[in-house]
């Protein structure tokens, strides 16, 4: 099953976090690409971040980022 465009956008936003930690946050500004703003909102709705505009990763978000980074290493 291929990733949807929305899922790829969510992965891009998630990948902006430098490490799987609740101590490092990001901010998606109002002038960012609309698809990135929407992706950040969806990540928040799914419980991966603590704010609609990025914020900090939740425990679930940290786990997701760890898995994303592991996948990137496998594909490199």
Language model region names:
Residues 1-38, 42, 70, 74-75:
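Short amphipathic alpha-helical interface segments
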Residues 14-17, 51-52, 60:
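Surface-exposed loop/turn and secondary-structure junction residues enriched for glycine/proline
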Residues 33-37, 51, 59:
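Generic alpha-helical scaffold signal
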Residues 44-54:
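A short, conserved structural fragment
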Residues 53-76:
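Accessory beta->alpha helical hairpin/"wing" motif in late/C-terminal subdomains of nucleic-acid enzymes
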